[in-house]
């Protein structure tokens, strides 16, 4: 006979059965109340619940008693029934409970102090079952404590002055706080009535209150207001740029539209205003320089130095001071609205300075016979036209009546030599053609024929 050997092979990983995990049962189930936490008993948090009654059992355990017909239940707070074998009926006999009534004066102070807020946190009126009442330890089971004594007056007249309800520490503290708050409010109201200054002061608690978040309509309205304000600002900047274009037509000022970005418009406007203010400050400092040149010429001339023509020479070389004057103008630049002096005062000072400058130039012209004002104006015109003060157009070199004849230029060249540009060659003119147009047409023809014969 053939023998068959059966070997058990473990299944492949892909075909393994899924076995659910089984966890061991917990001895107790803890629940946490998430709603209505005002009713949560604080002293039960983090503590093991010890019931005052033994746990329920599935089967009823009988307690041996002297009376064989009485069957006592193991569960407390249940009625005791008598069981008769012959009859299925039974009678319920409730447990008699006694209530000790004592007077307030006879109660010791230690018993009242023992009634702290911990036991008062339990609301015994919520549930009738004893299981939900305040827990007691096993040590005091079956014993009466002073804390369990309830003070019940003999008479039903609770509002009488002889019997007053006993309050716990928590209730007493709450009453004290309420009394203190009421006292503070009365004092504050009295001060407000007496002092009008105190009445105007806002309440600090109002500032601390958290404002509710804005609604969607409020957010949309704010966005619309922001867009309208931005458009108004753009129009104002466009108007200012148009004014600058009229005042300074030679300046290249860009054009913007209402669709342009406000930030770029603002930056461009600030840069243009800064450039113009720096240029005006440079021109002002040039006047100061000319005044300084004249003072140096007069002072050093009195000492004994030959300083004649110093101011005229410095006016011609004014470009050497341009860099320093630009740095000084940028250093002293202040944005619009940031000046210490108002516009009216600055305008009056400018008029006063120009008057003093004009008087000084006239006095110098009488003594030295040099027109400083015309020299200074000519240097300004040359600088604005883009040419240097040392170069003048060749048309004015030979003209003594031109206003630039006061300048004495060294190294002057002839007009023919100075011109280096290539010129187009025109038709050659003979002496015969010099009188062309002065005689009649017949004489012109004769002269032309003679000229042609001579050329042949």
Curated annotation (Swiss-Prot):
It comes from the Viruses. Residues 181-210, 217-231, 441-456 have a biased composition (Basic and acidic residues). It is a single-pass membrane protein. The chain crosses the membrane at residues 347-365. Residues 181-231, 383-456 are annotated as: Disordered. It is found in: Membrane. Belongs to the IIV-6 067R family. This is Uncharacterized protein 067R. It comes from Invertebrate iridescent virus 6. The lineage of its organism: Viruses, Varidnaviria, Bamfordvirae, Nucleocytoviricota, Megaviricetes.
């Amino acid at each position: 006979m053939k023998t068959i050997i059966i070997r058990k092979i473990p299944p492949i990983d892909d075909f393994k059965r899924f076995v659910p995990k089984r966890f061991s049962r917990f001895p107790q189930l803890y629940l946490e109340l998430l709603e209505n936490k005002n009713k949560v008993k604080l002293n039960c948090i983090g503590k093991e619940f010890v019931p005052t009654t033994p746990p329920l059992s599935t089967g009823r355990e009988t307690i041996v008693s002297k009376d064989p017909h009485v069957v006592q239940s193991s569960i407390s707070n249940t009625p005791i029934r008598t069981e008769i074998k012959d009859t299925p009926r039974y009678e319920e006999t409730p447990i008699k409970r006694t209530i000790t009534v004592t007077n307030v004066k006879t109660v010791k102070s230690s018993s009242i102090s023992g009634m702290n807020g911990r036991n008062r946190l339990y609301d015994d009126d919520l549930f009738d079952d004893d299981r939900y009442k305040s827990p007691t330890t096993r040590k005091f089971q079956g014993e009466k404590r002073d804390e369990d004594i309830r003070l019940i007056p003999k008479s039903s007249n609770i509002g009488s002055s002889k019997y007053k309800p006993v309050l716990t520490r928590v209730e007493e503290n709450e009453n004290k706080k309420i009394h203190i708050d009421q006292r503070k409010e009365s004092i504050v109201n009295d001060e407000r009535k007496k002092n009008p200054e105190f009445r105007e002061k806002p309440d600090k608690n109002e500032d601390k209150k958290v404002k509710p978040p804005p609604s969607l309509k409020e957010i949309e309205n704010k966005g619309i207001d922001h867009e309208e304000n931005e458009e108004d600002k753009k129009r104002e900047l466009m108007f200012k740029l148009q004014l600058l274009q009229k005042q300074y037509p030679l300046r290249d000022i860009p054009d913007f539209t209402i669709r342009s970005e406000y930030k770029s418009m603002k930056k461009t406007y600030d840069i243009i205003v800064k450039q113009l203010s720096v240029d005006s400050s440079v021109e002002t400092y040039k006047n100061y320089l000319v005044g300084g040149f004249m003072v140096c010429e007069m002072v050093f001339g009195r000492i004994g130095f030959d300083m004649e023509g110093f101011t005229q020479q410095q006016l011609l070389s004014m470009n050497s001071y341009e860099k320093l004057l630009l740095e000084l103008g940028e250093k002293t630049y202040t944005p619009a609205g940031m000046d210490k002096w108002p516009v009216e005062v600055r305008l009056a000072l400018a008029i006063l300075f120009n008057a003093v400058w004009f008087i000084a130039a006239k006095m110098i012209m009488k003594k030295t016979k040099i027109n400083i004002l015309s020299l200074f104006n000519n240097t300004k015109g040359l600088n604005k036209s883009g040419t240097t003060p040392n170069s003048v157009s060749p048309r004015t070199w030979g003209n003594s009546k031109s206003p630039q004849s006061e300048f004495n230029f060294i190294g002057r060249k002839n007009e023919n030599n100075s011109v280096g540009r290539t010129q187009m060659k025109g038709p050659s003119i003979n002496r015969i053609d010099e009188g062309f147009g002065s005689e009649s047409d017949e004489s012109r023809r004769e002269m032309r024929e003679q000229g042609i014969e001579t050329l042949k």
